[in-house]
Each structure stands twice: as structure tokens, then as C-alpha cells.
Amino acid sequence: MQVILLEKVVNLGNLGDIVKVKDGYGRNFLIPQGKAKRATEANKAEFEARRAELEKQQAEQLAAAQKRGEKLAGFMLQVTQKAGVDGRLFGSVTNGDIAEALTAQGFEVSKSEVRLPEGPLKAIGDYQVHIALHHDVVVEITVSVLGE
């Protein structure tokens, strides 16, 4: 199935690219999420008519993400969790916990934007965590896990 991408899709292409994808990926993910349309002649003509509008929208989203990223860059977040004597936590600190703590601090961050490369944090200490605000804007913050 050939589709026209309506926004940048990681590992696939950029706005306006016509790419060939598996039928299930196109029908079940790209098209319902509004990331692509089938590459028919009518849709190609409609896309070309709306191209400038879509590019402007994408540029605005990037600018907003960069603005949020400047505020977040280098931020140090402290999270407290019950811990044992050896420094291991009872439970763990997940991306949802980090997103909640950042929202409480005044930053709008969803849990899907928080990237934990080694999985949930399970011990006391300082960790570098990536916040992916946009495909092109990834900010690194420090999360300090403290024991109670």
C-alpha cells in the first residue's frame, strides 16, 4: 500500500513523502492516527493544495516543542520513594511517576514523552532521563531518586 505522509514519521519519512508500507501498518496505524492518507490521485491533489498549511502547522509544533525544551533543559527533579537499607526501592520509579512529578512542578509532560533507556529506576541515585517533546527535540534532565 502506498501512502502520503501528513507528518514526519520516525524510520519512515517526512511530510509529503509517498512511501510503500505494509497494508496492516497503513490501515491500522498510520491512517487512523491521521499520520497518512492513501496515495490516490485525488488525495495527492488535495495534499498539494494543503501542503503549505501542513508545513506551517508542523513548524509551529516544532517551535512550541523547542520553547518547552528550553525551559526543561538541565532541570533537576527530585522524586522520593520508600527504600530499603541497601538503597534499593520498594517498587520503582516509572515514566508515569516522572511525568506526574514534572506536571506538579509546572511542566506539561505526558508519560509517553519520558524515555527511560534502562527501564524503570529501581535504586536510589541520580539518573539522566530523556524527554522527547518532538521528533527533533529531545531534552535531558536529571532525576534524583531519594529514599524515605
Swiss-Prot record:
The keyword Ribosomal protein is annotated on this UniProt entry: yes
PROSITE patterns for this protein: RIBOSOMAL_L9
InterPro entries, per database record: Ribosomal_bL9, Ribosomal_bL9/RNase_H1_N, Ribosomal_bL9_bac/chp, Ribosomal_bL9_C, Ribosomal_bL9_C_sf, Ribosomal_bL9_N, Ribosomal_bL9_N_sf
Keywords of the record: Ribonucleoprotein, Ribosomal protein, RNA-binding, rRNA-binding
SUPFAM superfamilies per record: L9 N-domain-like (SSF55658), Ribosomal protein L9 C-domain (SSF55653)
Record has S-adenosyl-L-methionine as a keyword: no
Any one annotated GO CC term: ribonucleoprotein complex
Gene Ontology BP term (one): translation
Function: Binds to the 23S rRNA.
Protein name: Large ribosomal subunit protein bL9
Organism: Methylobacillus flagellatus (strain ATCC 51484 / DSM 6875 / VKM B-1610 / KT)
Lineage: Bacteria, Pseudomonadati, Pseudomonadota, Betaproteobacteria, Nitrosomonadales
